[in-house]
Design a protein with these regions (language model features):
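Short aromatic-glycine-enriched beta-strand elements
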Residues: 32-45
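Short coil-to-beta-strand transition motifs
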Residues: 12-23
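Netrin-like (NTR/C345C) domain of secreted extracellular proteins
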Residues: 1, 71-218
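Extracellular/periplasmic catalytic domains that process cell-envelope and extracellular macromolecules
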Residues: 15-16, 36, 54-55, 113-116
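Conserved positions in beta-strands of structured domains
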Residues: 27-30
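Short glycine/threonine/proline-enriched tight-turn/helix- or strand-capping micro-motif at secondary-structure
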Residues: 1-11
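Short edge-strand/loop segments of extracellular domains
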Residues: 45-52
Length: 218
């Protein structure tokens, strides 16, 4: 269970469901293909531990869905898995053997690409079999430090960049600002670490005013 299909309404819920909460810096990352899927392993240096049995300065691996591999690697991954996919022959016809080594297949799930040196707060789940971690609900479990002491959810940034057809990454030094004239549903939430830590200790009841929400018992 990678917690991809879960949604959390508060920092308190994220804290309760996380195995590990750390402030960490991306040291390196590697993309790889498996069948039709592409994933990215991020080597993360732990700068601060907010929850979990781990030491500051350790390195952990955080795996995320999506990434980019060469056309050659992607085709080989399908062949090794015994998968015959509709676009495999199209890829072979479109690219020569040399071009397959120079061109890439990218898969994105409205998520940001990692950037070496970037610092984020991560809410993580431990894999049951491997010594790796997954973010709680993908990008919703990551808050990027967009300026000193300020954090923005990675999914919110990715959604805005997708809507603007911008590259799916936040470059080092690139800041995020809130538009004071934006509608509430379009505004970006910017948190300080003190606000996050305080909300992690404060239970907030889930919203009940959306379609399909269970009615309060009488």
């Amino acid at each position: 269970q990678k917690e991809w299909d879960q949604f959390y309404n508060s920092f308190y819920e994220q804290k309760e469901r996380s195995d590990l909460i750390v402030l960490g810096t991306v040291e390196d990352y590697t993309c790889f293909a498996g069948g039709l899927e592409i994933a990215t392993d991020i080597s993360l240096q732990v700068d601060e531990v907010l929850k979990g049995n781990i030491e500051t300065g350790e390195n952990i691996t955080v795996r995320k869905r999506g990434g980019a591999v060469t056309v050659e690697e992607y085709l080989k991954s399908m062949e090794d898995a015994g998968i015959t996919y509709w676009n495999a022959e199209d890829l072979k016809a479109e690219y020569s053997e040399e071009e397959r080594r120079e061109n890439y297949v990218q898969i994105s799930f409205c998520d940001l690409d990692p950037v070496i040196g970037q610092k984020s707060l991560y809410f993580l789940k431990k894999d049951a079999e491997q010594d790796i971690y997954y973010r709680l609900c993908d990008g919703l479990g990551q808050y990027i430090e967009t300026s000193p002491g300020e954090y923005v959810n990675a999914y919110e940034i990715a959604s805005e960049k997708r809507d603007e057809n911008e590259p799916m990454m936040l470059a080092l030094g690139e800041t995020v600002e809130n538009d004071p004239d934006a509608a509430p549903e379009e505004s970006i939430n910017i948190y300080t670490m003190d606000e996050i830590k305080e909300e992690m200790e404060t239970y907030t009841a889930p919203p009940t005013d959306y379609p399909g929400a269970e009615e309060e018992p009488e």
